Regions:
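Aromatic/hydrophobic pocket-lining residues that form the small-molecule binding cavity
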Residues: 64-67, 128, 180, 184
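Distinct, well-ordered alpha-helical segments
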Residues: 71-72, 92-105, 123-133, 150-163
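Compact, aliphatic and Gly/Pro-tolerant "microcore" segments centered on a short helix or tight beta-hairpin
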Residues: 82-84, 88, 100-103, 112-113, ...
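Bacterial c-di-GMP phosphodiesterase EAL domain
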Residues: 1-107
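Short beta-strand/loop segments at the ligand-binding rim of alpha/beta enzyme cores
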Residues: 128-144, 188-196
Length: 230
């Protein structure tokens, strides 16, 4: 069984949906909005979302364990049988790959995807992506925040990500450029589906949805978030 440690006393999670052109949900991203440490009266939170850098490594792993144990408690009718993506950085990857119980548990969950952080260690070395390949044997592997960090066309050519998410700031940078559609279609040629983050207006939504197999995620749908506390 997965050991749920006592580093974190309370978590508030949010599932943020991404939407396809027909208005249906493509997937949910599992976000940590705030936490309460043991023997601490204040929540660690801010308006734009929780930052893992404020936690120790043990606390980060505890939050991750709470995330995966929470998924099986979610209301399936609200999820509409769509996948839930978990954010995975180098620390969490190491936790998954070196804990048999966690690995076996995740492998048996049919609705989980790994959303790989843009600073993942294997992107820096451009090696044979051994860890990513091992992760992909457990759950589908997606790339988060393309256009920032260590992401590049070289990276997505080296590993077959099922889905690629476009970084919010990168989207806002290129949305008005004539090359926008070329960039999105180029990225899409390397995967099955693209999700553009940071969509806040109807105009942006329409532009993204004009690209085939491209979904939107952002503040435009804040009322559709699914919150859960443990």
């Amino acid at each position: 069984m997965i050991k749920n440690s006592v580093e974190i006393d309370f978590c508030r999670f949010a599932l943020e949906p991404s939407f396809k052109k027909d208005g249906s949900i493509h997937s949910w991203e599992f976000l940590t909005k705030n936490v309460k440490k043991k023997h601490c009266n204040d929540y660690l939170a801010n308006e734009v979302g929780f930052c893992f850098t404020s936690l120790s490594d043990k606390e980060k792993i505890d939050v991750f364990k709470k995330q995966i144990l929470t998924i099986e408690r979610l209301d399936t009718s609200k999820l509409k049988s769509k996948p839930v993506s978990l954010n995975v950085d180098s620390l969490i990857s190491d936790c998954i790959l070196n804990d048999k119980y966690i690995g076996d548990y995740l492998k048996n969950q049919k609705n989980i995807a790994f959303e790989i952080n843009e600073h993942f260690h294997e992107f820096n070395t451009k090696c044979s992506m051994v860890d990513l390949k091992c992760l992909s044997k457990l759950c589908p592997v997606w790339l988060d925040d393309f256009g920032s960090g260590l992401t590049s066309l070289t990276i997505i050519d080296m590993f077959n990500f099922e889905c690629i998410k476009i970084d919010k700031d990168y989207f806002w940078e290129i949305q008005s450029e004539s090359e926008f559609f070329n960039v999105i279609n180029k990225v899409k040629s390397y995967c099955n589906f693209v999700i553009v983050e940071g969509v806040e207006t109807i105009e942006q939504k329409n532009k993204v949805h004009s690209v085939v197999d491209c979904a939107c995620q952002g503040r435009l749908w804040m009322s559709d978030y699914y919150y859960i506390e443990i």
